[in-house]
């Protein structure tokens, strides 16, 4: 399903089922249809009950692809009848298989379906077009021969997918982001149960916005500037669960960063984004005033002001600055370094440096106990706050600075140990996409503290 480019493995004949003893011959003839149409297919699922999911690869952006789609569907429907099977083994009929229901069940039974439908729903209000009186197979296509993939300007490198537009189109609509009982994707959908706040809903909204299919009241809103898109993306936590759990690896966190970058350009960057994006620099300043600021953080009036200015709920406790930073407590062990002792560099993230240095000190102790000499990295930010807030031009500048500091360590082949997963994600995934060339080199040397030992 995770195919790049315009040809996609799509679901329209994916639920056929026959008696298990007939499955081999059925699939052989099914694949003959696929190959005769000059394409391939993905196959998976439940062979033991005679229901293999076959998803042909079709480019629905061309008239030839649409004809191919319709022809395959018709031939497969006839094949199912030949083998005495079912066109819908477990997924239901809906719009995509509705046009074949009379062929599958016969005119008499089909008219019985219609009678029941008209008796209980004379106005056709409930799920119109499903099962009976369905529109033509090609009448509700997401794409079509007149569809043009949008090519919006992007800050990240989306060359792998053929641009930002095609990266958004990677969403296949399978709906794994709508699960509620397992995994992490998608936390906002798990809470709201609203399609708009699922990864699929957001991908569809972005696609519609980029193709001009949304109604815009303000000329500034055309494309990715629409407030509707902002509202749909607002609850995205940028946790990147979709990047790992989505079958096609949709990276909604990156799309949100791209959107915010464009949106701020059109509408102005709010104070909240500026402050949270520059939290590394502000933490350095705040540390100098820790004795004054720390007592304020627990004051109700200060929290209320914080909620008004930054949107941080007044009930949320705020981290306090440590009296002494990690770097001020660090003891450099290079002077006592034994010959041939493997050396690692501990990345000095913002939180560990200014708020909880004990985490960094404890990690260093563990690494030393494991036989490593530990050096402390420079006081640079991974760029995650800027990226998350959509300040991508600033993020690129920060990435260049961070890259210049980390490159000597990376060139020496020295592992860089990180304590924060979000920092690792930024250094390994985002910075190489914002930059080019040597950024790939430092990415290969970064390891999360909970990863296997660098020796491994």
Show the residue positions of the predicted features.
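Short, hydrophobic beta-strand segments
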Residues: 4-16, 52-62, 96-103, 344-349
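Short, conserved phosphate-binding/catalytic loop or strand-edge motifs used
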Residues: 48-53, 92-98, 380-383
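Conserved small/polar residues in nucleotide/adenosyl-binding loops
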Residues: 449-456
